[in-house]
């Protein structure tokens, strides 16, 4: 989305930094549109290299939407990199014009903090080129209305067995899988759970390795909305059920195996979340009507999101059901 010529508004314009070369204005739009109407997006280019500088600007129509975006997106993960999201600093009053703030080279030098790509490498450690992680999609219907696809990148570099289980259940190559199953448990501001393709109520499902398989590791954490993790009914009871986090859920760290994150379709996740209730029973039937594998996108290797944190007490749940 091209930037329009509007004056900078410090309460509506966000600085987003630290993302990798694969991020485009379209990607930023998809990541931030869930918080409200967007006026303009711009990613300044380095005309010497022909590449962007690893940061950009997003202006919202409403100040409260901009604030919500900061609350949810600052220090979140985008294509495997931890990004920063704050209000953009305005230029001096004497420098104001009809141009957007990011069109001012002096502003970029002073407040752009150089290359956001370099910042990302510093925060994530050394970045090495990867062949690309597997990506799968879930096409979702609410009632009779198709609302779109959720695209998930699988962390086969950290949890290969868990990632392969989910990939195969998306493709159906083992003769069974997620197509036609539902999100049977949806709790707003927490998570949406699905993957029970045998019973549909949270008591069924199976993995490609047998009824259950062991917890692979807990290196990846529940740090942000869009995190995808295995549901279970205790240690080493992973099957096919999974959940997508609607918010940061760090009390689940060390109890559930994180194996991926949503890279496209968070707007679909939010629409599904709206069908939830405090009890978890969806207001309408939410089904996965199509699923499969996409071509991987070559990119810089994502960080593993390892953190040392003390898990909090998990929610009380019915023991016979797999839960988040």
From Swiss-Prot:
It holds the Pfam family Pro_isomerase. Belongs to the cyclophilin-type PPIase family. PPIase E subfamily. Residues 137-293 form the PPIase cyclophilin-type domain. The keyword Membrane does not apply. This is Peptidyl-prolyl cis-trans isomerase E. Inhibited by cyclosporin A. Residues 12-90 form the RRM domain. Residues 291-324 are annotated as: Disordered. It catalyses: [protein]-peptidylproline (omega=180) = [protein]-peptidylproline (omega=0). Signal peptide: none annotated. The N-terminal RRM domain binds to nucleic acids including single-stranded DNA and RNA homopolymers poly(A), poly(G) and poly(U), but not to poly(C) nor double-stranded DNA. Binds most strongly to G-rich RNA species. SUPFAM superfamilies: Cyclophilin-like, RNA-binding domain, RBD. One of its GO terms (molecular function) is DNA binding. GO terms for biological process: protein folding. One of its GO terms (cellular component) is nucleus. PPIases accelerate the folding of proteins. It catalyzes the cis-trans isomerization of proline imidic peptide bonds in oligopeptides. Combines RNA-binding and PPIase activities. It is found in: Nucleus. Its EC number is 5.2.1.8. Keywords: Isomerase, Nucleus, RNA-binding, Rotamase.
């Amino acid at each position: 989305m091209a930037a329009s010529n509007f004056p900078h508004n410090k309460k509506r314009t966000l600085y987003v930094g630290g993302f990798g070369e694969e991020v485009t204005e379209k990607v930023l739009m998809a990541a931030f549109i869930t918080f409200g109407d967007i006026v303009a997006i711009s990613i300044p280019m380095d005309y010497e290299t022909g590449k962007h500088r690893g940061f950009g600007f997003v202006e919202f129509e409403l100040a409260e939407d901009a604030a919500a975006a900061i609350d949810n997106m600052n220090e979140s993960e985008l294509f495997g990199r931890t990004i920063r999201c704050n209000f953009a600093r305005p230029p001096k009053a004497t420098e104001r014009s009809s141009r957007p703030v990011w069109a001012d080279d002096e502003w970029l030098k002073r407040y752009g903090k150089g290359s956001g790509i370099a910042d990302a490498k510093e925060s994530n450690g050394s970045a090495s080129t990867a062949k690309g992680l597997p990506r799968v999609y879930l096409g979702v219907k609410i009632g009779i209305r198709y609302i779109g696809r959720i695209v998930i990148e699988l962390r086969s570099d950290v949890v290969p067995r868990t990632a392969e289980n989910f990939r195969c259940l998306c493709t159906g190559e083992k003769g069974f899988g997620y197509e036609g199953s539902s999100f049977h448990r949806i709790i707003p501001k927490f998570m949406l759970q699905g993957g029970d393709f045998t019973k549909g109520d949270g008591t069924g499902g199976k993995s490609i390795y047998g009824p259950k398989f062991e917890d692979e590791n807990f290196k990846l954490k529940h740090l942000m909305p869009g995190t995808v993790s295995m549901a279970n009914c205790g240690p080493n009871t992973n099957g096919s059920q999974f959940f997508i986090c609607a918010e940061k859920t760090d009390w689940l760290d060390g109890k559930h195996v994180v194996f991926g994150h949503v890279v496209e379709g968070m707007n679909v996740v939010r629409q599904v979340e709206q069908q939830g209730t405090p009890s978890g029973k969806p207001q309408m039937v939410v089904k996965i009507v199509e699923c499969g594998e996409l071509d991987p996108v070559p990119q810089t290797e994502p960080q593993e999101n390892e953190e040392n944190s003390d898990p909090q007490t998990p929610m009380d749940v019915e023991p016979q059901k797999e839960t988040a």
